[in-house]
């Protein structure tokens, strides 16, 4: 939960506005790509094609917990599966919406 609050605070400070779902997805995406790149052990001497192949393979081998969801995995076709995190704003306060 702390990561969500920090993201919102940092976003508001940097952009003078409230982040939307696309901002949260983009934020998570950067860190997912970072994790896949580390898993793939990318090196500067690799060709772009080899990097792409290694990243694609690594994406099917990682399982991540990020701000927008938990236990996120990807199929060989690139389709994600996750337990989504839903955040609502009530009275200016961010709250995680839990399933009942």
Language-model-derived ranges and their functions:
Residues 1-100:
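Extracytosolic ligand-binding ectodomains
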